[in-house]
């Protein structure tokens, strides 16, 4: 086997590295409710435009 064969990885099926933010491409805290697939930073920016309201 060549060294290049060791660098190929299969795609992740679960965990933090399995999903990316659809807006910025960041891995990590993804909000998946209603199929949003946004990280929490992007969600905070676009939530009012999507119709989400912040209650105290």
UniProtKB/Swiss-Prot annotation:
Highest taxon, organism lineage: Archaea
Keyword annotations: Metal-binding, Ribonucleoprotein, Ribosomal protein, RNA-binding, rRNA-binding, Zinc
UniProt entry tagged with the keyword Chloroplast: no
Cofactor mode of binding and number, as noted: Binds 1 zinc ion per subunit.
A GO cellular component annotation in the UniProt record: cytosolic small ribosomal subunit
MF terms in GO: rRNA binding; structural constituent of ribosome; zinc ion binding
Statement: the UniProt record of this protein carries the keyword Ion transport: no
Cofactor: Zn(2+)
A single GO BP: cytoplasmic translation
Residue numbers binding Zn(2+): 21, 24, 39, 42
Family assignment from sequence similarity: Belongs to the universal ribosomal protein uS14 family. Zinc-binding uS14 subfamily.
Quaternary state and interactors: Part of the 30S ribosomal subunit.
Function of the molecule: Binds 16S rRNA, required for the assembly of 30S particles.
PANTHER family the UniProt entry points to: 40S RIBOSOMAL PROTEIN S29
Protein name as it appears in the record: Small ribosomal subunit protein uS14
Organism this protein belongs to: Thermococcus kodakarensis (strain ATCC BAA-918 / JCM 12380 / KOD1)
Gene name as annotated: rps14
